[in-house]
C-alpha cells in the first residue's frame, strides 16, 4: 500500500455527470453490509479508482457500470489516504483507494470529465 501521491490525478466513476456526492464515496462493504466478502473484505472496504482517463472511459462501457454517468478527476494529496494497485481482468490500471476522513468533497480539487468525448461539429 502506498500513500496517495501528491498532486497526481486519480479517476473515479460517479453516479452523476458533474457532481461527486457522499454516495460516490461509499464502499461495497458499506453498500452491501450483509454480503460475505470473505478474503476480499480488504478490497470491498476501499474505492475502485483508475489511473488514467482512458481507463475510466473504457470501464464506463462495461454493462455492470452503466448506472455511472460521470468521471471525477481527483487531485490526490497524501492525507487523502492509501491506495494499492489492484489490476482486474477489465483494467490493468485499477487501484483500490482507502480514503481518510481528511478527504473532504467540499475542499478537494475535483474536475469533472465526460465519459464519452462528443465529436466536434464541422
What spans do the regions from the language model cover?
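Conserved NAD+-utilizing ADP-ribose enzyme module
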Residues: 1-47, 51-122
Amino acid at each position: 500500500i502506498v500513500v496517495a501521491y501528491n498532486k497526481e490525478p486519480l479517476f473515479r466513476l460517479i453516479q452523476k455527470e458533474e457532481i461527486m456526492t457522499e454516495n460516490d464515496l461509499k464502499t461495497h462493504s458499506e453498500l452491501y453490509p450483509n454480503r460475505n466478502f470473505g478474503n476480499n473484505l480488504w478490497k470491498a472496504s476501499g474505492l475502485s479508482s483508475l489511473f488514467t482517463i482512458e481507463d475510466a472511459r473504457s470501464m464506463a462501457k462495461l454493462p455492470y457500470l452503466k448506472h455511472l454517468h460521470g468521471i471525477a478527476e481527483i487531485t490526490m494529496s497524501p492525507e487523502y489516504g492509501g491506495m494499492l494497485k489492484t489490476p482486474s481482468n477489465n483494467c490493468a490500471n485499477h487501484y483500490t483507494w482507502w480514503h481518510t476522513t481528511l478527504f473532504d468533497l467540499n475542499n478537494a480539487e475535483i474536475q469533472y470529465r465526460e465519459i464519452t468525448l462528443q465529436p466536434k461539429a464541422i
